[in-house]
Amino acid sequence: YSGGVPPTGIAQPPGRTPGSAGASTSETIKSAPAPSKDCPGCTAARESLTLGALAARQTNRRTSACAGALRYSASWADRLPADVPLYPGARVTEAAGANTGACALRAVSFSTNARLQTVVDWYYTRVTNTGFTAEHQSDGTQHTLGGTRDRDGGAYVLFLTPRRD
């Protein structure tokens, strides 16, 4: 399948500032804390060519052990947990997942026309409102937002890179 790439602001509602799509929800958006400068996950993301390679490099053994079980299909983007959903208006570029006995893993790569800080703040709001911790890291170019939740052992990590266009 191939087709033309639509203009970046094609889904932008009238009167909205370009790059702010997805910022309006029923939640009050909280500002994520400033990132720490230590970002080992940023290097892993930059050096990984696939979602499976990135999963294999995670420090969490449960996640890295499941990397080999990942299967690629766009349908995995529809199976993200409700507490860590796909960003509104996101354009999925790659999706993978595993749902076996010991592995419940989802990985999705997407792009959006929203500013990086808007996306970080939106996810920070979503995850902290549902009981996850949130640690924001950056190496100056790449950002990560990751955390865990005690009540169910859930974990997430987001790797974010600003677009150059």
Regions from the PLM with identified roles:
Residues 1-165:
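An acidic-aromatic pocket/loop used at catalytic or ligand-binding sites
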